[in-house]
């Protein structure tokens, strides 16, 4: 009997390892092997050939310049906003935080569309500048890409830094003050130094997000002939050259090496700040400003955030209701035909249906599998759980365009002789989405699981409850609020995804992001703007609904704890009564 149990356990473990290798590791290995494949066999010929091309060197240089420039913008603005919101006594902090996080909630290609709408060549701003004898602003340039990417990545640095700032003990500041330091000196000598690992870590994440981003350089760079590695991989993949896929794989490996190296460096700085994870965040005011200074800073920050995050969106909203793109808005120009056109377009309706189906399916799969893995990680850690977490992290760390290409190479024939025929179908998109976003659910569910004491499960099991009852009555009600927060980000990312679908979708499986991209590339800017408006409204509505539901689920958590404590007390009292009897 014991031998049978061991054999069954071994078979289950072997199957799990096989699935991990098949889904996460094998596609990356296939991609690497494809980069070495040439007419003579396996060699470094593809690397030598590509590095000799001027366009390749230009793409690498552009990628580095754009990533460094946008990271500098994100690091400066993200850190500054974090200091202001965490430490000063400015009011409307929830509004300020929403304005800062807006580029994180809205897809980057919609933000790019809004900026291109604001600075269109026939638009009000450029026409005014031209009338004044000044040069027009061109966002279809390296400077434009840097600016838009920098604004898109501000929330990444902000979220990394603000939590660290709130965890720095006030005792350290007061100790510095007693030594004669002023508030400014204490902030520079103590808080800034303590927060530096988080600032560097956030900056590296912003750098990785910049080299991973396909949408911004595709929308602004392809038409103006500015190649970066992500768009260059896309160009090579859709070309029909004899060696196009091998060359695309080679470029993908180069981009992946940069991304993985950055991830490892970020991990080093992340560990330096991980020692403060157990410290509770302090929301007290540390830099009290006078009423006048507070108002100037508060309204100045709100104005600046509105200029970089709201004004471009308003311009895009205006374009969605215009007959002609890029001209001054007048009553003669007002129309709702753009919205009528997109909702009567079968391709658009199919894309919305596909995206909703993929987003919902991806969320359900990630919740079930991700939460199960997180439970095992927290309660029963082991080598298999570590392997699946590392593998899922790898597929999230590499750029999306690289993952998409690896999916093509792998799933055409995942095992020798087996051809599932899923390329160009919803199935390969679903596999790619789950592979891409599973780690977000694992980390979110693991964090939520850590907040639930094992004693709750042990007490429930001791009282005779089944595993299903423990999950249904205790774990799920306590997990649902934090788990839903992670799931919402997966849902929005999957719903508005562009990079994976640009490589994996076919005529009948186009997604929302791909339709907007196609409209923009075809010059149908008004239709792209109209569809983007619909997506922005849907995403923001979902964001506010999730926040509202989170407050309701918090009350449910409190009721679960109260109910459980009451039943435990009754059980104890009952045992005492029986014992005394």
What is each stretch, according to the model?
Residues 2-15, 92-93, 162-177, 183-184, ...:
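C-terminal transmembrane helix and the adjacent membrane-cytosol boundary/short C-terminal tail
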Residues 43-51, 187, 334-343:
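A short amphipathic helical element positioned immediately N-terminal to and/or at the very start
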Residues 60, 180-181, 189:
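Polytopic alpha-helical membrane proteins, predominantly small-molecule transporters/carriers
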Residues 36-44, 120-132, 222-232, 273-281, ...:
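Peri-membrane helix termini and adjoining interfacial loops of integral membrane proteins
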Residues 8-40, 52-166, 194-214, 219-221, ...:
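Membrane-water interface segments at the C-terminal ends of transmembrane alpha-helices
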Residues 288-296, 322, 330, 334:
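Extracellular/periplasmic ectodomains of large secreted or surface enzymes and adhesion receptors
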Residues 47, 230, 238, 339-341, ...:
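P-loop potassium selectivity filter motif centered on the GYG triad
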Residues 117, 215-242, 328-332, 498-525, ...:
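Glycine-rich helix-loop "coupling/hinge" segments at transmembrane-helix boundaries
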């Amino acid at each position: 009997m014991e031998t049978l149990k061991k054999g069954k356990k071994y078979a289950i473990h072997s199957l799990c390892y096989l699935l991990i290798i098949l889904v996460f590791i094998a596609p990356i290995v296939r991609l690497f092997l494809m980069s070495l494949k040439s007419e003579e066999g396996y060699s470094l010929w593809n690397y030598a050939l590509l590095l000799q091309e001027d366009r390749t060197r230009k793409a690498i240089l552009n990628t580095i310049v754009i990533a460094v420039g946008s990271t500098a913008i994100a690091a400066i603005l993200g850190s500054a906003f974090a200091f202001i919101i965490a430490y000063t006594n400015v009011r409307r902090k929830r509004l300020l935080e929403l304005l800062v996080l807006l580029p994180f909630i809205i897809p980057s290609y919609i933000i790019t569309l809004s900026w291109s709408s604001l600075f269109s060549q026939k638009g009000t701003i450029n026409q005014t500048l031209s009338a004044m004898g000044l040069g027009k602003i061109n966002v279809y340039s390296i400077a434009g890409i840097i600016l838009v990417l920098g604004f898109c990545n501000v929330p990444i640095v902000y979220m990394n830094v603000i939590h660290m700032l709130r965890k720095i003990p006030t005792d350290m500041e007061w100790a510095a003050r007693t030594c004669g330091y002023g508030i400014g000196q204490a902030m520079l000598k103590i808080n800034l130094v303590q927060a530096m690992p988080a600032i560097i870590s956030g900056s590296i994440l912003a750098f990785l997000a910049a080299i991973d981003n396909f949408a911004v350089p595709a929308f602004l760079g392809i038409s103006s002939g500015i190649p970066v590695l992500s768009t260059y991989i896309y160009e090579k993949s859709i070309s029909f050259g004899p060696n196009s896929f091998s060359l695309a794989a080679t470029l993908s490996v180069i981009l992946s090496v940069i991304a993985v190296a950055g991830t490892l460096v970020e991990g080093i700085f992340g560990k330096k700040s991980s020692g403060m994870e157990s410290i509770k965040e302090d929301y007290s005011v540390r830099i009290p400003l006078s009423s006048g200074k507070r108002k100037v800073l508060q309204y100045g920050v709100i104005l600046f955030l509105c200029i970089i995050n709201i004004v471009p969106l308003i311009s895009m909203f205006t374009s969605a209701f215009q007959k002609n793109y890029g001209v001054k808005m007048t009553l003669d120009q007002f129309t709702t035909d753009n919205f009528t056109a997109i909702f009567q377009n079968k391709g658009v309706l199919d894309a919305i249906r596909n995206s909703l189906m993929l987003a919902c399916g991806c969320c359900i799969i990630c919740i079930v599998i991700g939460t199960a893995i997180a439970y095992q990680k927290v309660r029963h850690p082991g080598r298999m759980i570590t392997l699946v977490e590392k593998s899922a992290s790898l597929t999230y760390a590499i750029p999306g365009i690289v993952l998409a290409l690896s999916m093509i190479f792998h799933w055409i024939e995942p095992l020798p002789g087996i051809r599932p025929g899923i390329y160009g179908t919803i199935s390969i998109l679903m596999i790619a989405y789950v592979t891409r976003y599973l780690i977000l659910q694992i980390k979110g569910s693991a964090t939520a699981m850590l907040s639930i004491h094992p004693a709750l499960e042990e007490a429930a099991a001791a009282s005779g409850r089944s595993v299903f009852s423990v999950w249904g009555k205790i774990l799920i009600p306590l997990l649902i609020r934090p788990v839903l927060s992670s799931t919402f980000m997966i849902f929005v990312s999957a719903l508005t995804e562009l990079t994976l679908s640009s490589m994996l979708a076919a005529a009948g499986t186009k997604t929302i992001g791909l339709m907007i991209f196609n409209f923009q590339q075809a010059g149908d800017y008004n239709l792209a703007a109209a569809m983007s408006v619909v997506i922005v409204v849907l995403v923001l509505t979902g964001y506010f609904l999730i926040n509202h539901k989170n407050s309701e689920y918090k009350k449910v958590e409190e009721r679960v704890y109260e109910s459980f404590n009451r039943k435990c007390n009754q059980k104890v009292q009952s045992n005492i009564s029986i014992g005394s009897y």
